[in-house]
Swiss-Prot record:
Subunit: Associates with pre-60S ribosomal particles; released from the pre-60S particle very early in the cytoplasm.
Metal-binding keyword on record: yes
A single BP term in Gene Ontology: ribosome biogenesis
Protein name (record): Zinc finger protein 593 homolog
Organism for this UniProt entry: Drosophila melanogaster (Fruit fly)
GO CC aspect terms: cytoplasm; nucleus
Ranges where the record places region Disordered: 110-162
Main localization (coarse): nucleus
Family under the similarity heading: Belongs to the ZNF593/BUD20 C2H2-type zinc-finger protein family.
């Protein structure tokens, strides 16, 4: 006779994975950050002193929605891949209610606009009047208007020979 087998604890050591998905660790979504960029970016950079936040809420990255302890930490953050990836993600216009309705069949598809995004100016520049620039990048309309298939090229060549 063998011994009775004990129940195995499959997810016993996964507490570090569970912590990652807790609500207190949630970051702001891209559409919320885009709304902050459009409406109140200067206000977020020049916040009042708050003793509960890191760096007394004086060093805030608007694109990543994150506080830093001092200016050197924030400038080092601007050079990291995390910040650069967030800038690239913010270049595309965020998902909207209109886009959801078009996806449900209540309209025609409109390609999301691509924008030029820059890192936020320093605090002194904001006091001087500089703001975060978000510009829509114009796309090439030549490629979408005329199809470049081999049949259309052949037809043009045939017309030239006759």
């Amino acid at each position: 006779m063998g011994m009775v087998s004990k129940r195995k604890k499959m997810h016993y050591g996964d507490t570090h994975l569970q912590r990652r998905w807790r609500v207190r660790n949630r970051r702001r979504d891209l559409d919320q950050i885009d709304d902050d960029l459009q409406t109140r970016s200067g206000e977020l950079i020049n916040q009042n002193v708050d003793l509960d936040k890191p760096g007394f809420a004086q060093f805030y990255c608007v694109h990543c929605a994150k506080y830093f302890i001092d200016d050197t930490a924030m400038q080092a953050h601007f050079r990291t891949k995390v910040h650069k990836r967030r800038l690239k993600a913010l270049e595309i216009e965020p998902y909207s209610i209109e886009e959801a309705e078009r996806a449900a069949g209540r309209g025609s598809f409109v390609k999301p606009k691509k924008r030029a995004m820059e890192t936020q100016p320093s605090k002194e520049d904001v006091v001087a009047g500089k703001r975060i620039r978000v510009e829509v990048v114009p796309e090439d309309t030549d490629a979408t208007d005329s199809p470049s298939t081999s049949k259309t090229k052949r037809k043009k060549v045939e017309k030239m020979e006759t």
